Every structure is written in C-alpha cells, then in structure tokens.
Amino acid sequence: MPMINVQMFEGRTLEQRRKLVKELTDATCSALGVKPDSVQIVLTDVKKENWAEAGKLFSDT
C-alpha cells in the first residue's frame, strides 16, 4: 500500500487539495500498477515560520 506524505506551505484551498490528491493517486496507480483504494496520502500544512532553506526561515524572505 503506497503512502505519500506531502508537506507544503499553508494556504491551499480545499479545491486545490482535492486536485492534488486526485492527481497524486492517479500517478501512483499508473506508475506502480496499484488500485486507487490502496493509495494513502497525508497532507501537512506548515507555516512559513516553521520551514527553512539555506539557513533562513521562509517567513524572513
């Protein structure tokens, strides 16, 4: 059973989330030859103040 974890900045709409999980599910089924009901996805919102790159918080850019 494929399990996909997606971490992204907060602020995406419910419609964007629906589209994302649909497309991730479709791609996973195509690539791995599994059925959609075996694909699990967890979406995690992260505030920019809790995410950094190259030693800088995204909230500081």
What does each of the following model-derived ranges do?
Residues P2-T61:
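A domain-level signal for the structural core that forms small-molecule/cofactor-binding pockets
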